[in-house]
Regions:
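Function-dense linear segments that define catalytic or interfacial modules
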Residues: 1-92, 102-112, 179, 184-206, ...
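Hydrophobic/aromatic-rich, well-ordered segments within soluble, folded domains that form packed cores
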Residues: 97-115, 294-306
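Catalytic cores of large soluble enzymes that bind and process phosphate-bearing ligands
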Residues: 36, 49-67, 90-97, 117-136, ...
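Beta-sheet entry/capping signal
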Residues: 1, 41, 95-100, 160-164, ...
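Internal maturation/activation junctions in enzymes
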Residues: 63-89, 93, 112-169, 246-251
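Catalytic alpha/beta core of large soluble enzyme barrels
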Residues: 27-33, 72-80, 164-306
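Domain-core detector
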Residues: 108, 152, 290-292
């Protein structure tokens, strides 16, 4: 987290009350005021972008914001009087900050044949997150009309100091149909996962559909992908396979985390941040041969992007 960027871009409710952000949570998507009397609260939910076409023309974002505000109210009511919750309650009552985010971003792109790198992905970023901003703010204004503005929002016409934050969603993404986590790329197209329930082989469902459509969804192909660390770049059967409206090579569409230029993740994050009033949980993945100069350049670009 770049604290200077965060405070420079704080929402009006924070600026008018002289509130500052001093730290973030362990996943870095929460950027809320803390002091001796206030601690931040995480009231989060995520929209499944792999189903975007099903909900883009509905009021899902609007109702999700109402839902989160209801969750915040229930927390306030249940935690009142409980020892140790005093600072969290104080922050919740005064600001009612929410964190509506997303999951399944890479799945969304892959299902449409859009590479993670390039202008098409940047366009989709702007389109989707501007919509989330508009609809969540509409909901907060309506909530304020009905229930009033909390202390830190007086004069803003809003029910909540904050509305949007993007959490990692690793577990939620599995429950949502094994889609990609948060706004990050897939680390691998096939991998072994160990859990309390046992050891499982996880495959990228979007890639599995492409292989099936081209008659090459075989165990031999998957074993080769697994041997290559989850990469499809050495699968000869995919050399001439194209997909999407723009006939993109499948190998470009299914690049894994480390195969994607990390500058692209930072640039997308910069676009996304224009529409998010908290922050984004975003990892970067560098190969072992990455130089300190290159890693420093990426982080400096992140700072410049805000």
């Amino acid at each position: 987290m770049f604290k200077g960027n965060v405070n420079k871009n704080n929402p009006e409710a924070y600026k008018s009350n002289g509130l500052k952000v001093h730290m973030t949570n362990i996943c870095s998507e929460i950027t809320l005021h803390t002091d001796e009397s206030h601690s931040f609260v995480c009231c989060l939910s995520s929209l499944n972008l792999s189903r975007y076409d099903e909900w883009k023309d509905t009021d899902l974002i609007y109702h999700a914001t109402w839902f989160l505000d209801g969750v915040m109210e229930e927390f306030i009511q249940r935690a009142k009087g409980l020892r140790g919750f005093e600072n969290a309650i104080r922050s919740a009552v005064k600001g009612r900050p929410l964190g509506l985010g997303v999951l399944g971003w890479h799945t969304y792109l892959q299902d449409r044949g859009i590479p993670f790198e390039g202008l098409s992905a940047q366009y989709e970023t702007r389109k989707i997150f501007s919509q989330i901003k508009i609809e969540s703010e509409r909901a907060s204004r309506d909530l304020a009309d009905l229930y009033g503005e909390p202390l830190w929002c007086v004069g803003t016409g809003m029910r909540n100091t904050h509305l949007r934050a993007i959490a990692p969603t690793v577990s939620n993404s599995k429950l949502a149909g094994n889609v990609s986590p948060g706004i990050e790329p897939w680390a691998a197209n096939v991998f072994t996962e160990q859990s309390a329930k046992g050891t499982f082989i996880r495959r990228n469902p979007s890639l599995e559909n492409v292989l099936e459509d081209n008659g090459i969804n075989t165990e031999k192909v998957w074993q080769q992908i697994l041997a290559d660390g989850g990469s499809v770049q050495n699968i000869e059967e995919l050399n001439d396979v194209l997909m999407g409206d723009w006939d993109e090579p499948v190998k470009n569409v299914f690049k894994t985390f480390k195969e994607i230029n990390q500058l692209e993740l930072v640039r997308q994050a910069g676009i996304r941040q224009q529409y998010i009033d908290q922050s984004v949980s975003l990892n970067l993945a560098f190969p072992s041969e990455a130089t300190p100069k290159w890693i420093n350049k990426i982080h400096m670009e992140a700072w410049k992007q805000g």
